[in-house]
Amino acid sequence: MVRVWNYSKASPQTTILPALVRYPNFEARTQCEVLKINLDKSGKRATGVTYVDTSGNEWEQPADLVLLCAFQLFNVQLLLLSGIGKPYDPNTGEGVIGRNYSYQVTSSVDAFFDNKVFNPFIASGSIGMCIDEFNGDNFDHGPHGFVGGGYLGAVQTNGRPIQSTRTPKGTPRWGLGWKQAVAKNYLTSYQVVTHGGCCSYRDAYCDLDPTYTDRFGRKLMRITFDFHENELKMSQYLTDRLAEVAQKMGPRQFEKKPRTAPTTLRFTRRHIPAAARSWAPIPRAAR
């Protein structure tokens, strides 16, 4: 187990909570989940929260001040479930809660070598180098027909034997041929990446799912989103520049993987630029 004592990892469990637990008037109730924000009779002021513990018991915690400090999507879900603010309506453009959802635009180039060993298992989240010349307004967008941009990066974060295994195009999906390709390319392949911004659009938003519920019977969060022409053009341009870098590395083979649409994503990432307009007209005590 590695303990980080220099507070370089800016997460609540490593920076905020260790400082708060020293105070006698602070209590951390772990493994509990807030179900809703409670409001007064006027519906204009938060009075506390209702939460459930590991035994399934519901508790009400009164409060003069309620802070929404969960992950962004859970904050939006709590606002919608609690009846706080006006839900966004994509048909009229009215409402703020769930509005302005945007994502990230990533792409990659897989490069396969014969004479280079990368040892992907020697990695961390901060090992890498980036080219920032194609980010934001760092270059002339005029001839390209899109706004925005992103970085070109060589970032080695992990060497997981399944999820991070790369095989060249034409490799069988299973069997002896696949095993041979994995054995040949695991140490000698590398993926360079792009990571770009994404605009907010009227047809991209979060709302409550009309069909599916969680284990408490609450409506799940639903995300309606796809990439637009601007992001697709940007991804193609960045990926082409990235391929030029990869080609200079001298691989025997490389494959470009720009972002395409339509797409269906299983949400796994934590990079969400927006999911609710700031600030929404919510009760003062719930901010």
What are these language model-derived features?
Residues 94-221, 229, 267-275, 281-285:
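FAD cofactor-binding and catalytic pocket of flavoenzymes
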Residues 1-4, 62, 219-229:
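Glycine- and acidic
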Residues 1-34, 264-269:
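Conserved redox-cofactor binding core of oxidoreductases
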Residues 35-40, 187-198, 222-225, 229-287:
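A glycine-rich dinucleotide-binding beta-alpha-beta segment and adjacent secondary-structure elements
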Residues 1, 161, 166-172, 176, ...:
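Patatin-like phospholipase A catalytic core
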Residues 22-23, 32, 36-42, 49-123:
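Glycine-rich loop(s) and the adjacent beta-strand/alpha-helix scaffold that form part
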Residues 44-50, 188-191:
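Short, hydrophobic/aromatic-rich segments at coil-to-beta transitions
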Residues 17, 76-80, 239, 243-246:
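Non-transmembrane alpha-helical segments in soluble domains
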